[in-house]
C-alpha cells in the first residue's frame, strides 16, 4: 500500500514536522508584537501567548475623554492580537509547507 519503506518514511516526516512545529510554537510564544491605535497614540506590546506586556499612552490623551481612551486601548490590544495571529499563520505555513488546516482548527492542536 505504501511501497518500500513508505510508511516508515511517512512516520519519520510526521515526526520531523511535529518537532519543527514545537520549535515554532516556542518561538511564537516568546515573540512580541506591538499593536497601535489612534495613529500611534496608544501602543500595546503583547507576547505570542497573548499576554499584554506593556501599554503606552501618549500624554496628550490623558486630558481627553476617558471613554475614548478606553476605546483606543481596546483597539490597540485587538490590533496586537491580530498581528500575532497573522504571524502565527505565516510561521506555521512555513513549517507545514502551506498545507491548509481544516476550518476552525488552530495551532497548536
From Swiss-Prot:
Domain of life: Bacteria
Annotated InterPro entries: YbaB-like_sf, YbaB/EbfC
GO cellular component: bacterial nucleoid; cytosol
Subcellular location: Cytoplasm, Nucleoid
Coiled coil: none
Keywords: Cytoplasm, DNA-binding
Annotated GO MF terms: DNA binding
Keyword Cytoplasm: yes
Any single Pfam family the record assigns to this protein: YbaB_DNA_bd
Function noted in UniProt: Binds to DNA and alters its conformation. May be involved in regulation of gene expression, nucleoid organization and DNA protection.
NCBIfam families, per the entry: DNA_YbaB_EbfC
Subunit structure: Homodimer.
Family affiliation: Belongs to the YbaB/EbfC family.
Name of the protein in its database record: Nucleoid-associated protein Sbal223_1770
Record organism: Shewanella baltica (strain OS223)
